[in-house]
């Protein structure tokens, strides 16, 4: 099993366990990081933030590092709190809780999102 298939298998397992809760889903690429808050039953995206957005990207020198992940974490938490979402389950999509994924999660917690 290669690295990508193993990550996707872990991600599917996590999604199955969290299917009845509001999820904060993280996806990362070499250049960008994406975060979405997804509704529990119908899998609709309620809130999204990423380094692709001009408002976030213009404040950053590089969109693929920890500073960018912190900016996305703060923005997604601010948007969630504005819509009345305070508690979510963290879905790291099979990625290790390390580096950019960890930075995004800690920034969201600092703003006030609970998970």
Swiss-Prot record:
Keyword tags: Ribonucleoprotein, Ribosomal protein, RNA-binding, rRNA-binding
Gene3D superfamilies: 3.30.420.100
SUPFAM superfamilies: Translational machinery components
GO BP term (any one): translation
GO molecular function, one term: 5S rRNA binding
GO cellular component: cytosolic large ribosomal subunit
Source organism, top-level taxon: Bacteria
Family, similarity comment: Belongs to the universal ribosomal protein uL18 family.
Xref: NCBIfam families: L18_bact (TIGR00060)
Database matches in HAMAP family: Ribosomal_uL18_B
Function: This is one of the proteins that bind and probably mediate the attachment of the 5S RNA into the large ribosomal subunit, where it forms part of the central protuberance.
Binding partners and assembly: Part of the 50S ribosomal subunit; part of the 5S rRNA/L5/L18/L25 subcomplex. Contacts the 5S and 23S rRNAs.
Protein known as: Large ribosomal subunit protein uL18
Source organism of this protein record: Baumannia cicadellinicola subsp. Homalodisca coagulata
């Amino acid at each position: 099993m290669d690295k990508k298939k193993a990550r996707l298998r872990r991600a599917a397992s996590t999604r199955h366990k969290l299917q009845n809760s509001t999820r904060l889903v993280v996806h990362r690429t070499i250049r960008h990081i994406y975060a979405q808050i997804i509704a529990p039953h119908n899998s609709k995206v309620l809130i999204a933030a990423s380094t692709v957005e001009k408002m976030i990207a213009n404040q950053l020198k590089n969109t693929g590092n920890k500073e960018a992940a912190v900016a996305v974490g703060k923005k997604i938490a601010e948007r969630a709190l504005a819509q009345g979402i305070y508690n979510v389950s963290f879905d790291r999509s099979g990625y290790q809780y390390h580096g950019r994924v960890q930075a995004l999660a800690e920034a969201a917690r600092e703003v006030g999102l609970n998970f």
